[in-house]
């Protein structure tokens, strides 16, 4: 692996983005090259170590996919250390140099997390990150830029926080730098890779929010000939300030992260985007970004996908704010309570985007074989069919998004009948056992 750096000095991050400088060494093809952003740029992981991302080039096309990895979120001490539960902020030790090539991290486990020694990038989390996956997708022949998440803020934060709720004697200083890191990656691509004939911004889970937040940043800096968005299982649901949690179940979460991650503070992502695109969004409602993007970029195709039975993103969204969920005695009862809120939010989310012809969506009911129906594009594309519409898997939606030859596909499964009753029942049972032990 070739170590690579992108910037020689720090510039004002509230003004123009840093310009890239020539790299040390020579880029390879069809191999993962590490890019490390220097500390002087303001980039870092949550623990203060350097932010690193990875590039897999091809000489045969300028088309490029940027992958924003999933990996949870955090706004308390144990979650940011990725301790006590799997459902916290991932990569609490930072990003290892061997992140994409070895399952075991080369970093010391300084956070004490039982999960951090595993390199998620080497797990094959998505077919989009593999040129040889049996789940085929057009972008496997493109240039691939893979962005790990290590800041616990779904790529949107700009705040140094101190958390001491779990251990007041040993407070944790945590760097929510996701917004800064992401903009620096965009600038690196613009300075070090050819202008893409087509740029796909793709993210799953936490990364799905990341690509939504930073779509405009990457478009402005990289200036691709054509650009598309694929956001999988990380929705920004309607949550206007001043609303009620009964009507908008994600409101307590949004209120919390605004403060914890500095979203509304000077230099935060909300005032920054509103200053750049005046009048296009509503500062009181993070979900206004969902409709701002198709307004700003009417010629770009934007696709959103999730599962109606996703208990994982629902748990992240609601568990810390609704005591009745955590106090329910069984995981089945907890999931039922989660999904009541989750499914209530899907309708208004889709309704807000329906007026825009460049927006499409693919919403199956369940995919029990993957993380309690979390994500349509993780690991494989299997079990993502919508039989009532004759759609065999999510790849039909992805091809429609990328080809651009027809109106955007809009597919929503109305049936809740299991596609494979016996298999789904067994998988759900195993998932319940697993997730109870992981803290769900």
Spans of features found by a protein language model:
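A signal for specific C-terminal beta-sheet/loop modules enriched in small/flexible residues
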Residues: 1, 15, 84-87
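Bacterial N-terminal signal peptides that target proteins for export
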Residues: 2-14
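Hydrophobic helical h-region of N-terminal Sec-dependent signal peptides
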Residues: 18-19
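C-terminal His-loop and adjacent cap/lid subdomain of alpha/beta-hydrolase
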Residues: 27-440
């Amino acid at each position: 692996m070739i170590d690579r750096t992108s910037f020689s000095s720090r510039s004002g991050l509230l003004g123009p983005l840093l310009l890239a400088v020539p790299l040390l060494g020579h880029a390879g093809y069809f191999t993962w090259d590490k890019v490390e952003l220097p500390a002087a740029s303001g980039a870092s992981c949550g623990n203060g170590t350097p932010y690193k991302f990875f590039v897999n080039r091809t000489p045969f096309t300028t088309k490029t996919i940027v992958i924003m990895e999933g990996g949870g979120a955090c706004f308390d001490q144990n979650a940011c250390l990725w301790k006590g539960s799997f459902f916290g902020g991932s990569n609490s030790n930072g990003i290892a140099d061997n992140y994409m090539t070895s399952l075991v991290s080369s970093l010391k486990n300084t956070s004490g997390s039982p999960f951090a020694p595993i390199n998620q990038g080497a797990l094959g989390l998505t077919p989009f990150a593999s040129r040889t996956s049996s789940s085929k997708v057009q972008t496997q022949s493109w240039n691939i830029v893979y962005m790990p998440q290590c800041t616990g803020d779904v790529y949107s934060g700009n705040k140094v926080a101190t958390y001491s709720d779990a251990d007041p004697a040993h407070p944790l200083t945590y760097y929510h730098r996701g917004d800064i890191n992401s903009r620096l990656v965009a600038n690196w691509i613009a300075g070090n890779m050819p202008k893409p004939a087509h740029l796909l911004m793709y993210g799953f889970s936490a990364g799905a929010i990341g690509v939504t937040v930073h779509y405009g940043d990457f478009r402005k800096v990289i200036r691709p000939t054509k650009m598309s968005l694929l956001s999988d299982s990380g929705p920004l649901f309607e949550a206007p300030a001043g609303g009620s949690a009964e009507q908008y179940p994600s409101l307590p979460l949004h209120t919390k992260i605004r403060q914890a991650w500095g979203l509304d503070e000077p230099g935060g992502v909300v005032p920054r985007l509103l200053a750049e695109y005046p009048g296009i969004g509503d500062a009181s409602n993070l979900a206004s970004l969902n409709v701002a993007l198709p307004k700003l970029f009417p010629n770009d195709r934007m696709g959103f996908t999730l599962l109606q039975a996703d208990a994982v993103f629902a748990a992240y969204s609601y568990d810390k704010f609704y005591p009745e969920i955590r106090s329910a005695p069984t995981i089945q009862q907890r999931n039922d309570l989660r999904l009541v809120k989750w499914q209530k939010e899907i309708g208004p989310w889709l309704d807000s985007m329906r007026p825009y012809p460049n927006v499409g969506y693919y919403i199956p009911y369940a995919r029990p074989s993957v993380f309690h129906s979390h994500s349509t594009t993780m690991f494989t594309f299997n079990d993502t069919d919508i039989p009532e519409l004759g759609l065999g898997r999510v790849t039909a939606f992805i091809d429609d998004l990328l080809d651009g030859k027809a109106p955007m596909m809009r597919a929503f499964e109305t049936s809740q009948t299991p596609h494979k009753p016996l298999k789904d029942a067994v998988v759900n049972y195993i998932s319940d056992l697993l997730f109870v032990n992981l803290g769900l």
